[in-house]
């Protein structure tokens, strides 16, 4: 069984609510990959971007820091606020939210992008790694959402977007990496619960997941995966832009796939997103 994929898709492209100039987007894990791609997309529209992530010094295998991302955001036309934030620590979260309000005065959208992953079986997943995945994926998503909510509810078109998959209960998605699947589905359950909880408050809570694997520095470290058969992270950024442009009062509780969103917006050719257009894209996790 797969939790409902989507509803309320606009068939006329992005909605009239797509003016993000001076709007504030709070993004966790925005130093690289999908998070940074989303940040740059909104920066091009003149948005204020909060980079809430841990990396302040370059990692030899995973390049990019919050300060590097901030420079790129400013160059793209946005305003950046890099804040070192471990989303497992509620004090750091609260401090990041307060810094955001002090600088920009509002939070209009939250993108819960930060995630920890270990594709390992039960006997190969020590509790330290288990706790990391649950601390970041479930607790972190919940805690950041909770901290941002009082300010989101003051926005005229507030959105929470979790980079999370549909809940697919096919046992094959649990068989090889039970801990990660449960932790990732925790982010999805936040969408189900919060969208229902705040459905009368005009707050949209949705999930976005890539239909195919996305080319990131982390993906290139996975043995046996052909990164050329992946898509650029810009496809997720374009889909996120479309979703956050929709009326928050009528678009909530959805589990969107990036390709589905863009098809609804009129996109028919996805070859420009491919790392190698001659390759067949590899489906992402949790999709049958």
Identify the function of each model-found stretch.
Residues 24, 31-32:
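Conserved glycine-rich cofactor-binding loop
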Residues 45-68:
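Conserved glycine-rich Rossmann-like NAD(P)H-binding loop of the short-chain dehydrogenase/reductase
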Residues 121-122, 126-131:
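Substrate-binding pocket helix/loop in short-chain dehydrogenase/reductase
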Residues 207-208, 224-288:
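C-terminal helical subdomain
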């Amino acid at each position: 069984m797969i939790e409902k994929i989507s509803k309320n898709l606009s068939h006329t492209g992005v909605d009239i609510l797509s003016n993000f100039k001076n709007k504030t987007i709070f993004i966790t894990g925005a130093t690289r990959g999908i998070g940074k791609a989303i940040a740059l997309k909104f920066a091009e529209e003149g948005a204020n971007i909060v980079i809430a992530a841990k990396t302040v010094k370059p990692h030899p295998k995973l390049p990019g820091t919050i300060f590097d991302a901030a420079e790129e955001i400013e160059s793209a036309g946005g305003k950046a606020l890099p804040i070192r934030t471990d989303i497992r620590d509620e004090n750091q979260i609260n401090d990041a939210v307060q810094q955001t309000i002090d600088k920009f005065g509002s939070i209009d959208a939250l993108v819960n992008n930060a995630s920890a992953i270990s594709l390992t079986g039960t006997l190969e997943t020590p509790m330290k790694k288990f706790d990391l995945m649950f601390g970041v994926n479930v607790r972190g998503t919940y805690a950041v959402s909770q901290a941002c909510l009082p300010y989101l509810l003051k926005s005229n078109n507030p959105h929470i977007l979790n980079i999370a998959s549909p809940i697919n209960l096919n046992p094959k998605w649990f068989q090889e990496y039970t801990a990660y699947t449960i932790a990732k589905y925790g982010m999805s359950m936040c969408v189900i619960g919060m969208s229902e909880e705040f459905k009368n408050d005009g707050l949209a809570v949705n999930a976005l997941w890539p239909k195919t694997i996305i080319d990131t520095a982390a993906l290139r470290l996975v043995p046996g995966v052909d990164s050329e058969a992946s898509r650029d992270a810009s496809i997720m950024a374009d889909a996120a832009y479309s979703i956050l442009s929709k009326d928050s009062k009528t678009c909530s509780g959805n589990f969107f796939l990036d390709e589905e969103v863009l098809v609804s917006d009129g996109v028919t050719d996805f070859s420009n997103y491919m790392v190698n257009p001659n390759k067949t894209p590899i489906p992402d996790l949790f999709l049958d």
